[in-house]
Amino acid sequence: MAKTAFIGLGVMGAPMAGHLAAAGHDVAVYNRSEDKSRDWAQRHKGRTYSSVANACEGADIVFSCVGNDRDVHEVFDAACKTMRKGAIFVDHTTASAALARELAEKAEACGLGFLDAPVSGGQAGAEAGKLTVMAGGEPSVFAEAEPIMRAYAANLTLIGPAGSGQLAKMVNQICIAGVLQGLAEGLHFATRAELDIEKVIAAISKGAAQSWQMENRWQTMVEG
């Protein structure tokens, strides 16, 4: 089993780290707000730390799932100082492709592997361990990290070199935006036509209009 660290215990990161622990990996966690770390430790087997550097010390593989480019940069800069040589840094944050390329170069200079690996599937996918991962990086690094990521991901694809994972996530978001726009217009039409929305969804969700967004978002969209 791998010695891992997971940085960022939000709605996605907490269950992802939990699946790593459940799979038997040695998991160290860090979160900026310590209450989330304590809550995670009460529910899972693992160790909590008060700094990124301490959590990542001697790790074989470090995962981050944080807020934005700046957060990723700060986490990487701290982690690379204490990770063992030859270890891998996997960034699950939805961030920029430019940052991914920059960190891949820095990782290589530090003797580390790097993957930009944004995810899709939402909180439900994270909790079920069924996320989709689109990765950018070296094939050898992906091959080493993939079995560990299987703890929380059902579908993993190496898209191409560093930055490719983030670009693929952009494609994913563009497609989702189109689906959401169509779903919003359809729900608006059904409301104006005074149809029973639940019956409409029950019918069309079994046909060609079915989508993950319809299944998981229609009710909150109707409620506003």
At which residue positions do the language-model features occur?
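Rossmann-fold NAD(P) dinucleotide-binding segment
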Residues: 52-112
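Rossmann-fold dinucleotide-binding core
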Residues: 4, 94-177
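NAD(P)+-binding Rossmann beta1-loop-alpha1 motif at the extreme N-terminus of oxidoreductases
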Residues: 1-64, 87, 93, 123
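Helical "substrate-binding/catalytic lid" subdomain
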Residues: 164-224
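Hydrophobic beta-strand scaffold residues
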Residues: 27, 48, 113-115, 156, ...
